C-alpha cells in the first residue's frame, strides 16, 4: 500500500525517537507527509484521586509548554516542520483518531511497550488506537 499522509503518535518517553524515526522512514519511502502528535492526558489520580480537583492553570500551561518544547526537539531530528507538530490535551485514543480523521491520515504510527495480554503485544494506548482507527496502524516495538 502507498501511504500519502502519516501520523506518528508519541508519548515523549525517551523511546519516542524510535517511533518518529520509523514514521519518517515510512514517510520517506512513500513520499508521504508526516505529522507528529503528543496528547497530554490529565489523570484524575495525579490530581486528587477520585475527586475532581481543578488543575492549576499555570501548571497546565507549564506542562503544555514543556511538551511542545520536547516535541519540537524530537521533530527537529527528522525535519518535521512546526505546522505539522501537534500538542493536544484529552484522552489519547480520542484525540489521535480525531486528528487523524481531520488530516485524512492513512497510517498512524504508535510505539508499544505494554506488559500483559494484548496490552503486552501492543501497549494499552496503541491497542486502544488500533481498535478505533479507520486507517492502518503500525506498532513500533520500543525496547525497555
From Swiss-Prot:
The keyword Aminoacyl-tRNA synthetase does not apply. One of its GO terms (cellular component) is cytoplasm. Keywords: Cytoplasm. The keyword Chloroplast does not apply. InterPro entries: Rossmann-like_a/b/a_fold, Universal_stress_UspA, UspA. Homodimer. Involved in stress response. The gene is uspA1. It is found in: Cytoplasm. This is Universal stress protein A homolog 1. GO terms for biological process: response to stress. Belongs to the universal stress protein A family. Its main location: cytoplasm. SUPFAM superfamilies: Adenine nucleotide alpha hydrolases-like. It comes from Coxiella burnetii (strain RSA 493 / Nine Mile phase I).
